[in-house]
């Protein structure tokens, strides 16, 4: 797979594609009835390969625009809140909406007929995959949306909405057609940003998207889905992403220029020294470092601690340090920071993980050089070697050479585990839980090497983590963790819990770092886990079931009526 560094040389030869790159970081809202998006390619300005690259870049932009909301709602990252009804504005989905309707769907309509004339089956298959993914995710986040009448320009300036179920059916049809396109030898794209033109990998990604769609609506009882899912699983080696070599991910580079090729989260965490601009979730970090009797080495790759002891800081920097936990918080709920004792604060301990609680919207103190930052995986940041120094700027870690983890091999294993458990096969579910964990650990610990780094991780001067000991014990620690969670022994978590689905989903969340889409969907589909950290300032737990339509779309489309509230469920959530 090629990074955006490689892509840049080609893009600079086309002003049209350069405009698409700028749109990756755009938050502007363009209504469905705008006839020509300033970021969209036109037949006069681009060839088929440029259209394809534009769709791929907008696929990355679309995913980046929806992943954070899902992470915040599932406590993977911090939600400011303070309440669900006002946590997100009616413009929250404007960016993804624009990426889908003004860019992906429009480029699809322009590209596919031209590719069909040339018989470029691979191009068509990729386009159908990307369109299907966007369609599915729009339904997952928004419910019923315009589809059959959308992206038609002057033919329909006020497209009506289609039911989420019908859009899923249309997306499934595109997926099945894409599979057929990938089965035909054809012209390869000149610059495939995901798979380098590999039809085999695109076919596996398409099968995995089909599995995701059918599993997602399993509670809606489509009679054909069970047979299709079982067939996909039976031929998993050929049908699905089961190893990391076929991971569907968008790779970033290290170019700090215009256009910036680095992972967006790297820029927000490492652009300036000691200026991390977001908070980690206290409860999510605790799952890695405080809730089990085994070491989870992924913590060193996911999170970078700038400070070694939260208790050493004053009330201006950590104001909750002198507060009592809310009455609706159980004693087992993390509050303020990991190790905080709100009954006897002097007995508090800290290992430096500095985040916030779910829905904490307090003011922002001068703690940009103290907060825990995103680490090495998946944004290309700094591995946590225990040196406890503030972020030093743009040259740390992999310098932004990260990924958007859209459909990874570990996700496939967890989806199969869920399907097996939901159908009463606990032993198969356990086996796929174990293999999903193994895939996750392998991906995370091998990430630096995958992205082209000379070493597995970077240990710096002043590190308190012993490099030889850490790397030498990786395999033992990974095996111990998998055995502790999903082993066959009588004392494993799997064999001692009464809530196997809850355990499975919780472990899936820990593997999903960087992908809030699958976490948000899985939470609503399974109603697991049941012990997520409550909102800080209210016991009300009416979590967002779907997002509001973008305000400007409602204002400008007389066929679109805003939802009554955030509790409107999507069709498969029952």
Give the label of every model feature segment.
Residues 23-34, 76-84, 139-149, 467-482:
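Short, compositionally biased low-complexity segments
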Residues 46, 77-448, 497-499:
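Structured, solvent-exposed acidic/aromatic patches
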Residues 413, 421, 438-574:
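C-terminal functional modules
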Residues 2-25:
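Sec-dependent bacterial lipoprotein signal peptides
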Residues 64-73, 144-145, 225-226, 518-521:
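Beta-strand acidic-aromatic groove motif in beta-rich domains, primarily in extracellular
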Residues 27-74, 80-84, 91, 95, ...:
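Membrane-proximal, proline-rich intrinsically disordered regions
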Residues 12-13, 52, 125:
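Alpha-helical transmembrane segments of integral membrane proteins
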């Amino acid at each position: 797979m090629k990074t955006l560094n490689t892509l840049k040389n080609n893009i600079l030869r086309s002003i049209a594609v350069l405009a698409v790159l700028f749109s990756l970081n755009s938050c502007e809202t363009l209504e469905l009835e705008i006839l020509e998006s300033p970021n969209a390619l036109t037949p006069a300005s681009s060839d088929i390969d440029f259209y394809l690259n534009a769709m791929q870049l907008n696929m990355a932009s679309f995913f980046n625009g929806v992943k954070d909301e899902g992470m915040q709602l599932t406590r993977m990252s911090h939600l400011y809140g303070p309440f669900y009804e006002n946590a997100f504005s009616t413009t929250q989905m404007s960016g993804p909406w624009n990426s889908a309707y003004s860019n992906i769907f429009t480029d699809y309509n322009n590209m596919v007929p031209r590719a069909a004339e040339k018989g470029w089956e691979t191009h068509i298959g990729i386009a159908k995959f990307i369109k299907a993914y966007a369609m599915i995710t729009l339904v997952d986040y928004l419910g019923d949306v315009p589809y059959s009448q959308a992206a038609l320009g002057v033919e329909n300036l006020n497209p009506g909405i289609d039911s989420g179920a019908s859009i899923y059916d249309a997306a499934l049809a595109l997926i099945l057609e894409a599979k057929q396109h990938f089965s035909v030898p054809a012209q390869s794209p000149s610059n495939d940003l995901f798979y380098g033109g590999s039809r085999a990998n695109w076919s596996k990604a398409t099968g995995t998207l089909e599995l995701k769609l059918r599993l997602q609506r399993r509670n809606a009882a489509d009679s054909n889905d069970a047979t299709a899912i079982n067939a996909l699983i039976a031929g998993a080696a050929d049908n699905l992403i089961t190893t990391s070599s076929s991971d569907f991910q968008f790779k970033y580079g290290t170019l700090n220029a215009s256009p910036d090729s680095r992972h967006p989260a790297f820029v927000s965490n490492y652009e300036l020294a000691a200026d991390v601009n977001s908070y980690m979730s206290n409860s999510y970090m605790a799952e890695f470092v405080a809730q089990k009797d085994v070491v989870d080495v992924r913590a060193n790759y996911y999170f970078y601690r700038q400070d070694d002891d939260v208790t050493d800081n004053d009330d201006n920097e950590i104001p909750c340090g002198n507060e009592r936990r809310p009455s609706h918080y159980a004693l087992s709920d993390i509050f303020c920071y990991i190790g905080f004792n709100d009954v006897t604060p002097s007995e508090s301990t800290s290992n430096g993980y500095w985040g916030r609680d779910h829905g904490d919207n307090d003011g922002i103190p001068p703690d940009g050089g103290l907060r825990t930052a995103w680490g090495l995986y998946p944004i290309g940041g700094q591995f946590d070697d225990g040196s406890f120094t503030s972020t030093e700027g743009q040259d740390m870690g992999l310098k932004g050479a990260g990924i958007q983890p859209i459909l990874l091999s570990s996700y496939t294993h967890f989806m199969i585990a869920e399907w097996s458990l939901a159908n009463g096969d606990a032993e198969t579910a356990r086996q796929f839980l174990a293999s999903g964990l193994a895939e996750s650990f392998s991906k995370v610990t091998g990430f630096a090497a995958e992205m082209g780094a000379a070493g597995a991780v970077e240990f710096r001067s002043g590190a308190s983590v012993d490099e030889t000991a850490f790397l030498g014990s990786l395999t033992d620690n990974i095996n111990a963790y998998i055995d502790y969670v999903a082993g066959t022994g009588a004392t494993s978590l799997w064999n001692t819990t009464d809530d196997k689905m809850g355990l499975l989903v919780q472990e899936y969340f820990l593997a999903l770092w960087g992908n809030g889409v699958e976490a948000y969907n899985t939470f609503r589909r399974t109603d697991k886990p049941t012990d997520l950290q409550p909102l800080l300032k209210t016991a009300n737990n009416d979590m967002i079931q779907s997002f509001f339509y973008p305000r400007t779309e409602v204002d400008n489309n007389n066929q679109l009526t805003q939802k009554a509230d955030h509790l409107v469920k999507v069709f498969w959530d029952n």
